[in-house]
Amino acid sequence: MDPLIDPCVFVDDDGQAYIYNGGGQICKGGKLKDNMVELDGEMKEMEGLEDFHEATWIHKYNGKYYLSYSDNHDENWNDGVKGDNRMRYAISDNPLGPWKSMGIYMEPTDSYTNHGSIVNFKGQWFAFYHNS
């Protein structure tokens, strides 16, 4: 397995575990074996993501898979300096895609990078992220 940047593990309703990671504008995902330390097949590139940078997170809502990630902050340059990361998301009917980019769900915080997680806790949805 290649080195992992910002790995994320998602366990689906049927108990199947998946691992995702990404950096350098490429996001990959793959099935894990039951021991959750070995791949069950090859990692594959996640298709359909727009401006992917890093910080992959997967959650499932109403039968759809949501992949959220930090973008390359290419559109929000300020005086020739790259701006801060925004959080984007994409949806799919399959945990390994293909994905349909849905846009930005959070503008930059006061931190150059961002990494978010969306979780359900006691029936309520929360988005976690970091800033300075």
Residue ranges and their predicted role:
Residues 1-132:
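Carbohydrate-active catalytic/glycan-binding domains of CAZyme proteins
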